Amino acid sequence: MANNYTYGIIGAMDNEIDTLVGDLENKKEEKKYGLTFYLGKLKKYDVVIVKCGIGKVNAGRTTQVLISEYSPKYIINTGIAGGLNQQLNIGDIVISTDLIQYDFDVTAFGYAKGYMFIGDKKEPTKYMADKDLTEKMKK
């Protein structure tokens, strides 16, 4: 198991990772659990790139395999976003500061959209992004 990867990069579709995979130096390919991982260097960083397939379940499964097998310090999801804001154009880079479960709705029970319950623990409506990583991405 390798533990020296700074970034794990996940994309849902081939066209979301192809350019990054093509730019890898010292590229190595590994197949695990039905997934193909591309290892190498992007600029000065050791990275592992993987296509997860579309959907939250595929993303979650692939993220767990990525963590278990390669232990990246940071995980980045790259890809195509839907038309959320008319001020955004193709090629724009969006860096999130927080996220919600957009498709999880318990408002009928008096809670905010995205509010989560896991066991007896109440989860926050918003999950905050890592501030250090957010700042690095802006550079």
Give the label of every model feature segment.
Residues 2-6, 31-139:
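Glycine-rich phosphate- or other oxyanion-binding loops that anchor nucleotides, phosphorylated ligands
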Residues 4-24, 46:
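Short, conserved "active-site rim" segments that organize catalytic pockets and cofactor/ligand binding
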Residues 23-31:
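Short glycine-aromatic motifs
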